[in-house]
A protein has these predicted regions:
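Conserved Rossmann-fold NAD(P)-dependent oxidoreductase catalytic core, especially the SDR/UDP-sugar
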Residues: 110, 114-117, 121-173, 178-179
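Hydrophobic/aromatic anchor residues within beta-strands of the central parallel beta-sheet
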Residues: 85, 127, 188-191
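Flexible, Lys/Arg-rich cytosolic regulatory linkers and terminal tails that connect or flank
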Residues: 1-27, 143
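N-terminal Rossmann NAD(P)H-binding glycine-rich loop of SDR-like oxidoreductase domains
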Residues: 28-46
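Conserved glycine-rich Rossmann-like NAD(P)H-binding loop of the short-chain dehydrogenase/reductase
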Residues: 50-65
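Conserved Rossmann-fold cofactor-binding substructure of NAD(P)-dependent oxidoreductases
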Residues: 84-107, 316
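Strand-loop microenvironment adjacent to phosphate/nucleotide-handling motifs in alpha/beta enzyme folds
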Residues: 13, 17-22, 174, 178-195, ...
Length: 407
């Protein structure tokens, strides 16, 4: 079963001139180069004949794997591209500045982020440091070094966020919007998309693993829906949207209709040549080896090979997701890419709030972090009313060292 089998719509075709504008013959850096989206960006950009590909990644193993894959791909396709593997964190400004300057980077795709909703919900401070201040560091370094184009990979979870991950990505957008409002040689833009089929930790990987182990498939709610795209589609959207940017743009993809996760689970089971049936989710969550079968409130799926159970929404999880803030999407030259009209702040307005946020992270002051989320134009409406960091829960008086804010 491939992700394309489950998409439920035609993939979005790329426009070659947009794909080439910021990549062909350019020095391109990808942060988070070893991740699901970052690695696909690397593959797509390699085929577009960049001068150099600078892979910036904090995970040694992920960097090793993507470097080896790209070098093999370049050799097999006879593409003369320099591939530069750099270990580093986006939270380290000196390392970022040195890498950008040394290789005279022209385009940056910022894909490095903590993205898993439940993990970030319980590791609030590190989520903020990486997603907010990591973005501030790399975006500021790009501006100072005269990078031509900076594209932030964002998410539909940044729209009226109900979880910490979404809130941090919306603040990252505010950072890029604020930098775009100032005189600069760098064109800043943001690209939002929904869930990526087959990416690290995606529902497809989860369901495939659950099917292989005999089930049950775990669905958090019968009515939960998500927008989806394939990994190549997501990478192509990022590349093309960045090429259309004028500065401060928020791009979104027309992803068709949202997909019901329950329907996705049923389809995956059937595409494996099996039949699904429902079991009691409460009994499963209590550790029952053989939870009782149910009719799924539909009178159907009482008999089958693979069980499906409903486990309840996770911390910070939305039932439905939106791709746009407001009701004024504007078209672009790509028929399936639009721009969203978003509230923004200047750096003069934003920096004092970020200073407060950094101080709250250093002090592990979760309550102040919550207030700052409410003060910023995020439309933050947490589904989890008890925001708490796992370490803060155990030692609320402990103060951790944090990187200094860019001045």
């Amino acid at each position: 079963v491939t992700p394309e089998d489950l998409l439920g719509r035609d993939p979005v075709a790329p426009i070659s001139t947009l794909m080439e504008k910021n990549t062909t013959g350019k020095v391109v850096m990808i942060s988070g180069a070893g991740g699901s989206i970052g690695s696909e960006l690397c593959r797509q950009i390699l085929y577009l004949n960049p001068r150099s590909l600078v892979l910036f990644e904090t995970s040694e193993y992920a960097l090793y794997r993507i470097e080896a894959e790209l070098k093999d791909l370049a050799q097999r396709t006879c593409i003369p591209v320099e591939i530069v593997p750099i270990l580093g964190s986006v939270q380290h400004p000196k390392r970022l500045k040195a890498a950008i300057a040394a290789y005279e980077v022209q385009t940056i795709y910022h894909a490095a982020a903590y993205k898993h909703v439940p993990l970030v919900e319980e590791n609030v401070i590190e989520g903020i440091r990486n997603n907010v201040f990591g973005t501030l560091e790399i975006a500021t370094a790009a501006k100072r070094q005269g990078v031509e184009s900076f594209i932030l990979i964002s998410t539909d979870k940044a729209v009226r966020p109900t979880n910490v991950m979404g809130a941090t990505k919306r603040i990252a957008e505010l950072v890029c919007q604020a930098l775009a409002s100032e005189p600069s040689d760098t064109v800043f833009s943001m690209v939002r998309f929904g869930n990526v089929l087959g990416s690290s930790g995606s529902v497809i990987q989860l369901f495939r693993s659950e099917i292989e182990s005999g089930g049950p498939l775990t669905v958090t709610h019968r009515d939960v829906t998500r927008y989806f795209m394939t990994i190549p589609e997501a990478a192509q959207l990022v590349i093309q949207a960045g090429a259309m940017a004028k500065g401060g743009d928020v791009f979104v993809l027309d992803m068709g209709q949202p997909v019901k996760i329950m329907d996705l689970a049923i389809s995956m089971v059937r595409l494996h040549g099996l039949q699904p049936y429902f079991v009691d989710g409460a009994a499963h969550s209590q550790g029952a080896k053989e939870p009782p079968r149910t009719d799924g409130d539909s009178g159907e799926l009482e008999q089958g090979d693979i069980p499906i159970c409903v486990t309840g929404l996770r911390k910070g999880e939305k039932l439905y997701e939106e791709l746009l803030v407001g009701n004024n999407p504007a078209p672009t030259q790509h028929p399936r890419i639009m721009t969203a009209s978003e509230t923004s702040l200047t750096m003069v307005q934003l920096m004092p709030v970020l200073e407060r946020l950094l101080a709250a992270c250093k002090a592990q002051d979760i309550q102040t972090i919550r207030r700052i989320f409410n003060d910023l134009p995020l439309e933050y409406s947490p589904s989890n009313p008890h925001l708490a960091d796992l370490i803060w829960n155990k030692s609320p008086q402990t103060v951790l060292a944090a990187p200094q804010l860019v001045k």
